[in-house]
Regions:
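Helix-to-loop junction immediately C-terminal to a conserved catalytic motif
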Residues: 51
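ABC ATPase C-loop
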Residues: 132-133
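H-loop/switch region of ABC-family ATPase nucleotide-binding domains
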Residues: 175-176
Length: 228
């Protein structure tokens, strides 16, 4: 079991179909990396491979690497604090300080006693992120963390992820929203057909992303950018 997540020249087949082609990728501390590309590009597959959840992929230390799948919602009868405390399971302890820090970081400390099924979608997403933060990982792997959120909530989540990276963690997030990726990520990795087409600083990633999505390269991808 490796302590961190990394892929080195990985080719992966599932159900007889090659889903990753010679992929090399490693998260970097201090960076928010957005994985972008059209449906079926291999974004979630790459993320799950990093998390060691696919056959033949090394499983990183769960105390060091936290994975949040798309739409992660579990144990809805629990309170926010109880959900976040589940993040301590990999450490086999019930330490409360990391739980409190995670709720403060994610801006949900005031909701600690609220049931997760009775708060907004954005607040519930923050509770799932806080559960991952409570693990105190070095690497955060997030599949579509802004999916189904309204624009303001999506920007809030991306700001939080960028701050988290700039505080020294490695953060990797799958995103269909090119505008959010370009505005908040430090790097954008563009995938298509299970291959990495480009790995670029965010402010240089639009042409490659446009190619992958079949967009017109000069199109404005970000009509609703908000201040960071």
């Amino acid at each position: 079991m490796d302590s961190r997540a990394a892929l080195h020249h990985v080719t992966l087949s599932l159900a007889g179909r090659v889903v990753l082609h010679d992929v090399t990728f490693a998260p970097v501390a201090g960076e928010l990396v957005a994985l972008c590309g059209p449906n079926g590009a291999g974004k979630t597959t790459l993320l799950r491979a990093l998390a060691g959840l696919l056959p033949g992929c090394d499983r990183p230390d769960p105390r060091r690497v936290a994975y949040v799948p798309q739409g992660a919602r579990s144990a809805w009868g629990l309170t926010v604090a109880q959900i976040v405390a589940l993040g301590r399971i990999p450490h086999a302890d019930a330490a409360q300080a990391p739980v409190e820090r995670a709720m403060e970081t994610c801006g949900i400390a005031s909701l600690r006693d609220a049931r997760v099924d009775r708060i907004s979608g954005g607040e519930a997403r923050r509770a799932m992120l806080a559960r991952a933060f409570a693990t105190e990982p070095d690497v955060l792997l997030l599949d579509e963390p802004t999916a189904d959120l309204d624009p303001a909530a999506a920007h809030d989540v991306m700001r939080l992820l960028r701050r988290t990276a700039e505080n020294g963690r490695a953060v990797v997030a799958v995103s269909h929203a090119i505008e959010l990726a370009i505005q908040y990520a430090h790097r954008v990795v563009v995938l298509a057909g299970g291959r990495i087409l480009a790995d670029l600083p965010a402010d240089r990633a639009l042409p490659a992303a446009a190619t992958a999505f079949g967009m017109r390269a000069g199109a404005d991808p970000a009509p609703r950018l908000l201040p960071r």
